[in-house]
Structure formats: C-alpha cells, structure tokens
C-alpha cells in the first residue's frame, strides 16, 4: 500500500519544519516545492539524512516543478512573503495574492484531488483566493489559523492556571488578525468554563482580558522578538494536526478558516469557525450560538476579512 503523498508548497521556515514533522510522524512521503533553486532540494536532503537517526523511512524530494506534486493527497501552502517587524498581515496582500494565483493553478493542474491547507497571510483572504484560483471544492480547501490561535490561547491559559495544556480546551473565531475572537465562554479547564473559574477565584476578568489580547497579538509578539521573520514551529504543528485529521479520518473538531454558507451568519466567504475535519475534508461547520456581544465581535472580524477580499478583487480582475 502506497504511503500518502504530501506536497509542501514553499520551502521556507514553515515549509522545512513541516517536512521534518511529516517525516517524524511518518504521515507520508514529502515533495517540497519552492521557486528558489536548491533550497527545497537542500532541505529535503538534510531531513532525509536524519532518517537513520530518527528511524523514519519517508521519502523526501525537493523540486521547482509543480509536475512533481502530481497526485498529492495533501497540499500545505506556505509560499509567500513572511511578516517583518512593523508589518501587519494585511500589508502582504498584493505580493502574496500573485503567489496564490501561481500556486492555485499549479494545484489545479497537478493535484486536483488534494486536501489543501493554506498558511500564507493574510490568511482568510489568501485561502479564499487560493480556492478561487484552483477551482477545487470549497470543502477541500481551508486555512490554518484557528488551530494556531487556539493553541496560543490554550498555552497562555495553562500558564495562568498552572495546569497541563492537555486539560485546557479553547477555540478562536473570526479572521486571523487583530479582530480575531478568542471565545472565553466556550473555553474550559477540565470541562470547567472560564467564567466559572473567575467565580472560583482562579483568575480575574482583567487577567483573562489580557490573555485574550495577548492571543490576538501572538503573531506580532513573535515577529517583534525574531526581528527577521515570523513564527514557524507552532504554525507548522497546527497544520500537521489538520493534515493528520484528514489523512486518518479522525473527525477532529478543529477551528480553521472554512468556506461558510450561512453558518454563524456568514455566506460566501472564508472565516475562522469550528469545523469537523475527516476524510471528506471540511465535513461540517459547527454553527455555535453566540451572545450579542460575541456576534458583534465576530461580525466585526468578518467585515475586516470582507475588506481584504474586496481588495483582492480590485488587484486581480479575474476574482471579481
């Protein structure tokens, strides 16, 4: 039985980390694509040479040809320009939109049956454009954002409560940006909702508010510290979690940028919502009920994404 084929489009920091994780977890064979000659080949060879020590048999190949991704089961897209200090995710729009056109056409022509996970920023607009350019079914194209944002939220909460991260559940709604909506009401520690933990004296509303804001600023915090790029370890592990759910038909409940068709009041666009990921791709969107305050924050985030999508249409007339 052939191993799954996983195409990684972009061999930068996230792409290289993804390739290593795929090999370590033995999720499949890897094709690492990048337009920079030598970079994907070098990283693929370096990771392959760690196989004898790590004990994996995955095959890794670096390439500049989309023909090599033919028949891929999963495509994870990281191609594009990363953020640098002082840049917002939205500043990347024009540059990375052109990249998504090239990538979308490459996937359309060579791996039309793949499950596609986009990581390129500004995420919600880029995954929308990628689906448009590729023509793949919307349930087979999604964006990695909510898993990462939720992981950051869970990390900060576990630190605050001094408990295992395994016992913290949390999810983040909305666009992958400053308007994201970390859901306090739907987040728990061992099943105990965060508002109840305030009543129990475990924390205060002020501390939770600060954690929510730090979650929103999570990417910028790392950009500011690194100074030469953006996060890559946590984004890569988040995308692997999604890919594994698809490849193993795990039916995982994971927040991600998915195409909404009326869920949570959103129609005809991608935004961060809780989903079920299995062998059918995005098999279901969980239409959670929101309070008026939560809905207002979510709508504000959706409107920010709409603005970026409209900007994409203005840049590339084929999207209008």
UniProtKB/Swiss-Prot annotation:
<feature type="binding site">
    <location>
        <position position="34"/>
    </location>
    <ligand>
        <name>NAD(+)</name>
    </ligand>
</feature>
<keyword id="KW-0816">Tricarboxylic acid cycle</keyword>
<keyword id="KW-0520">NAD</keyword>
<keyword id="KW-0560">Oxidoreductase</keyword>
<dbReference type="GO" id="GO:0006099">
    <property type="term" value="P:tricarboxylic acid cycle"/>
</dbReference>
<dbReference type="InterPro" id="IPR001557">
    <property type="entry name" value="L-lactate/malate_DH"/>
</dbReference>
<feature type="active site" description="Proton acceptor">
    <location>
        <position position="176"/>
    </location>
</feature>
<feature type="binding site">
    <location>
        <begin position="119"/>
        <end position="121"/>
    </location>
    <ligand>
        <name>NAD(+)</name>
    </ligand>
</feature>
<dbReference type="GO" id="GO:0004459">
    <property type="term" value="F:L-lactate dehydrogenase activity"/>
</dbReference>
<feature type="binding site">
    <location>
        <position position="89"/>
    </location>
    <ligand>
        <name>substrate</name>
    </ligand>
</feature>
<dbReference type="InterPro" id="IPR036291">
    <property type="entry name" value="NAD(P)-bd_dom_sf"/>
</dbReference>
<feature type="binding site">
    <location>
        <position position="121"/>
    </location>
    <ligand>
        <name>substrate</name>
    </ligand>
</feature>
<feature type="binding site">
    <location>
        <position position="83"/>
    </location>
    <ligand>
        <name>substrate</name>
    </ligand>
</feature>
<dbReference type="Pfam" id="PF02866">
    <property type="entry name" value="Ldh_1_C"/>
</dbReference>
<dbReference type="InterPro" id="IPR022383">
    <property type="entry name" value="Lactate/malate_DH_C"/>
</dbReference>
<dbReference type="GO" id="GO:0006089">
    <property type="term" value="P:lactate metabolic process"/>
</dbReference>
<comment type="function">
    <text>Catalyzes the reversible oxidation of malate to oxaloacetate.</text>
</comment>
<feature type="binding site">
    <location>
        <position position="96"/>
    </location>
    <ligand>
        <name>NAD(+)</name>
    </ligand>
</feature>
<dbReference type="InterPro" id="IPR001236">
    <property type="entry name" value="Lactate/malate_DH_N"/>
</dbReference>
<feature type="binding site">
    <location>
        <position position="152"/>
    </location>
    <ligand>
        <name>substrate</name>
    </ligand>
</feature>
<dbReference type="InterPro" id="IPR011275">
    <property type="entry name" value="Malate_DH_type3"/>
</dbReference>
<dbReference type="Pfam" id="PF00056">
    <property type="entry name" value="Ldh_1_N"/>
</dbReference>
<feature type="binding site">
    <location>
        <begin position="10"/>
        <end position="15"/>
    </location>
    <ligand>
        <name>NAD(+)</name>
    </ligand>
</feature>
<comment type="similarity">
    <text>Belongs to the LDH/MDH superfamily. MDH type 3 family.</text>
</comment>
<dbReference type="InterPro" id="IPR015955">
    <property type="entry name" value="Lactate_DH/Glyco_Ohase_4_C"/>
</dbReference>
<dbReference type="GO" id="GO:0030060">
    <property type="term" value="F:L-malate dehydrogenase (NAD+) activity"/>
</dbReference>
<protein>
    <recommendedName>
        <fullName>Malate dehydrogenase</fullName>
        <ecNumber>1.1.1.37</ecNumber>
    </recommendedName>
</protein>
């Amino acid at each position: 039985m052939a191993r799954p084929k996983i195409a990684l489009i972009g061999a930068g920091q996230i792409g290289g980390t993804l390739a290593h994780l795929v090999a370590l977890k033995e999720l499949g064979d890897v094709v690492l694509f990048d337009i920079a000659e030598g970079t994907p080949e070098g990283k693929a060879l370096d990771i392959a040479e760690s196989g004898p020590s790590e004990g994996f048999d995955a095959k890794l190949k670096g390439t500049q040809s989309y023909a090599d991704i033919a028949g891929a089961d999963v495509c994870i897209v990281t191609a594009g320009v990363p953020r640098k200090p002082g840049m917002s995710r939205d500043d990347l729009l024009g540059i990375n939109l052109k990249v998504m056109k090239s990538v979308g056409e490459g996937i359309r022509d060579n791996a039309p049956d793949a499950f596609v996970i986009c990581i390129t920023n500004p995420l919600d607009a880029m995954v929308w454009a990628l689906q448009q350019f590729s023509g793949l079914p919307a349930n087979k194209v999604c964006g990695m954002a909510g898993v990462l944002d939720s992981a950051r939220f869970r990390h900060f909460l576990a630190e605050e409560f001094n408990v295992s991260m395994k016992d913290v559940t949390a999810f983040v709604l909305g666009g992958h940006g400053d308007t994201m909506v970390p859901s306090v009401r739907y987040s728990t520690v061992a099943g105990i909702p965060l508002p109840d933990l305030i009543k129990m004296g475990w924390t205060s509303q002020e501390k939770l508010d600060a954690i929510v804001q730090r979650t929103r600023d999570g990417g910028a915090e790392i950009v500011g510290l690194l100074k030469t790029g953006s996060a890559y370890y946590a984004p890569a592990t988040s995308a692997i979690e999604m890919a594994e759910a698809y490849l193993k038909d795990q039916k995982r409940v994971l927040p991600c940028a998915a195409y909404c068709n009326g869920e949570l009041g959103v129609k005809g666009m991608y935004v961060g919502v809780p989903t079920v990921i299995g062998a059918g791709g995005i098999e279901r969107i969980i239409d959670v009920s929101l309070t008026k305050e939560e809905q207002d924050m979510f709508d504000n985030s959706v409107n920010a994404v709409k603005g970026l999508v409209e900007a994409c249409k203005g840049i590339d007339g084929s999207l209008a």
